[in-house]
Structure formats: C-alpha cells, structure tokens
Amino acid sequence: MGNHSNWPEWIYVAVVIALMTWVGAEAWEAERLVEHIPEDAETIIVTGQQWFWTFEHEDGTKEIGELHVEVGKAYKFEVMSKDVNHSFNIHDYVVLMDAIPGRVNTVWFAPDAVGEHDIQCREYCGLIHYNMRGTLYVEEPSH
C-alpha cells in the first residue's frame, strides 16, 4: 500500500479546479456585461396598469401600447406598476422585468435590427391579462 501513487488524484483535482475557475470567470464576465448599462442609454419609463403599458421617453413624449425606438441605440427601461404586479416582456430581445407597485426595476437592451416585436405582460394581473399587449417598433434613426 505504501507504493500507491497519488498523482492521478492530484491531476483530477487540478483539472476540476481549472474548470471551476474557467466557468466562474465566464459567468462573472457575462453578468458584468448584462448588468452594465451604457452611459449613453436613453431612459424610458415603463408603467404597467390593468391592462396596458405606457412608455415615457426622456423628452416627455408618451406612448400607450406601442413603443418606437431606433436601431443601434441603447435603452434603459425603468419599470413600475400603478396597481398590481405585472411583468414587462419583449420576448425577441430576452427582456423580462417585474413591474411592482412602489418599486422601480431597471433593465436595458440595444435593438440590433429593424422590425416589429410583441410586448406582453408575463404575470397574471386580472381578468383581461391575456390582452395586456403592446408592440415594439424598431426603426432606422431619424437624424
């Protein structure tokens, strides 16, 4: 028994530690990218209420049920609710954020292609929840 070599165990431990370090570093980098809101992002206040969405741009422009943004720009959504819990979702851009009364939650995105996308509520919010939808219009810059 005294001649038993521990090298295979040490190699196994070293490989596991290396893999765990690599996975941790990749996860940290992904979180940093997702959580970092670009400084030039335009803020849009998103308010959910039974049973529609309102959007207020930095310049005071308000939209109900539809949101117009420009391709290639970053947008920060400040999501809130006037009544009950909602959940703001743009499925095509993997945007999902809870809208809770008395609380402001933030999420950001940067559309990369012109097009139309569904906006919906992903939290049951009452009888007409199924109809709490909107449309995101990603357009060319208007210069």
State where each predicted segment sits.
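Histidine- and aromatic-enriched segments that form or immediately flank copper-ligand environments
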Residues: 54-59, 83-101, 134
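Solvent-exposed coil/turn segments that connect beta secondary-structure elements
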Residues: 49-51, 72-74, 80-84, 93, ...
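Extracytoplasmic entry segments of secretory-pathway proteins
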Residues: 1-67, 71, 143
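Beta-strand-rich interaction surfaces with strong enrichment in secreted/lumenal proteins
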Residues: 64-67, 94-98, 108
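Surface-exposed loop/turn positions
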Residues: 67, 71-73, 103, 115
